[in-house]
Amino acid sequence: MPIPEFIKSLRAKIGTELLHVPVATVMAYDKKGRLLLVQDKPSGLWGPPSGIIDPHELPADAAVRETWEEAGVFVELTHILGVFAGEHFSHVYENGDQLAAVSTVFAAQVIRGTPRPDGMETSDARFLTPAEINALPCSAHFKVIRKATSSVETRAYFKPASWCPEGLLSCGPEDFF
């Protein structure tokens, strides 16, 4: 999805100044235990689907929506892996816009869909094994998330997603099997 309208409106007021935004990120696994990654179109780097949480949108809904938009895969969120921020979650775009993200990272299971890039933000989308991931150029924020969540044993509460792809009447796992 292109730049959200509320970000464009803020940019018109603040220019390229640093903007702090909430982001949802999804570590989604298929039945074979492979991780869904997307290749960022501008940079060529690989990482999990993620994106800005729109005003009044639940983080869980943003996570499910972004995974659908960027990779064509519908997921069921299982738990929160962590909340991340810092230098590896900041970016300066080619036009000078500065962004610092606070990312809520969710674990998820794939319910439906075959990975496909959106063609705007992502140029590739695949399920990958750890060995395949190790051979790819990955984003700094993904490296931080991957290292920090490799041994997570506790689960945090979150309100489950209610967002559903347009045209589907119901989105529970039982509706897809």
What are these regions (language model features)?
Residues D30-E70, W163:
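Conserved Nudix-box catalytic region and its N-terminal flanking loop in Nudix hydrolases
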Residues L45, P115-F177:
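Nudix hydrolase/Nudix homology domain
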Residues A85-T114:
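Active-site-adjacent beta-strand/loop module that shapes the phosphate/pyrophosphate-binding cleft
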